Amino acid sequence: MNRAQAQRMYEDVSFLTQLRPFRNYENLESLAAVVNYLKEELGLLSQGFFEQKWMAEGNEYTNLIHSYQPNKTKRLIMGAHYDVCGDQPGADDNGSAVAGLIETMRLVYENNLELDYGIDFVFYCLEEPPFFGTEEMGSYVHAKSVSNNKENIIGMICYEMIGYFSDKKGSQGFPHPALKLLYPSTANFIMTVGVPEYDKFNQMIYKGMKKDSEISVYHFAHSLGRSLAGMSDQRNYWKFGIPALMINDTSFERNPNYHKMTDDIETLDFDRMSQVIDSMLRCLTRIEVS
C-alpha cells in the first residue's frame, strides 16, 4: 500500500502559509486562491468537484467537495477547514489538516481502495472567528445540506491541527489536572476527540487508527461542546444527529503558536504527520458498515 509522503504535504502547507494577504474571511482573493489550488492538485486524481456556496456578511464563501465512490449509498465525510484566524500563516491551524486531507485523498486513489462506503472529502471555509459557533460556518452549511437531503451518513471525521509534536518531557498541556493521570506528558501522540453520545463510531475510528500505528493514538471523549470535544467542524454534525469526531494534536494545549504569527511551517513535524495519515488510511479499510 502506498504511504503518505511528507514532501507532498510540506509543499501543500508551503503554498497555504505563503499566501498574502492571509487566508482569513476578509481576504476573499486568498480564499479563492486556496480553492483553485485544491482543484488543481486534486484534479490530477479525479474530476467532479462541487462548490457549495453561501453568503455571510454580504460576501460569498465556498466549500469544495469531492465524492469518492459516488455510487455508494452509505457515505463517510472527511473534512478540514482552510481559513485562518486573523493575520497569521496558520501552518498547524489549519494548513496541516488541509495537507493531510489532500494526502488522504491522494492515497485513496493511488491505492484504489475498494470500500463498502463512499467518502465525501470536504474543504470548509469559515471555521474561524467571527463565524465559529454560528450557522455561517462552512461545516454547518454542509451538515445541514446532507441532513436536508436525508443522505445516509455513517459519520464524519474532522482533521484539525495534526502537525505539531514534541519529544520534550512536559510539553503536553491539559485542560484539567485530572487528565494528567490518563495521558502522556510528552506531546508526541495524536488524539481522536469525540463525545460519548457517539461512542460506537468513535471507538471504531480510534481502534482502526491505533492498530499497527507508528504513532501513538489516544482517545478523548467529553460531553457536547465541552473542552476540546467541540472545538472544530465536527460540532456541527452533532446538531443533525450525525456521529463525528476530530483528529487533533490537542491544539493550544500543546502548540504555543496557536493563532499567532509564529504558527509557521518550520514548527511542523511532517514525518509524524505522515504517520497520522498512514494510520487513518489503514483505518478506512477497517470501517464496518451495516
Q: What are these language model-derived features?
A:
Residues 55-57, 70-72, 82-86, 126-130, ...:
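Solvent-exposed loop/turn segments at secondary-structure junctions
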Residues 3, 167-290:
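Active-site-adjacent substrate-binding region
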Residues 12-23, 123-124, 183-188, 259-261:
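Acidic/histidine-rich, surface-exposed loop or edge segments in extracytoplasmic proteins
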Residues 8-71, 218-220:
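A non-catalytic alpha/beta surface segment that caps or lines the substrate-entry region
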Residues 1-3, 20-29, 52-54, 85-94, ...:
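Second-shell loop/turn segments in exported
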Residues 85-203, 226-229:
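Acidic/histidine-rich catalytic neighborhood of metal-dependent amide-processing enzymes
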Residues 8-11, 15, 29, 33, ...:
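Extracytoplasmic/secreted proteins, especially bacterial periplasmic and envelope-associated proteins
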Residues 65, 76-79, 120-123, 154-159, ...:
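Structural recognition of the beta-strand scaffold that forms the well-ordered cores
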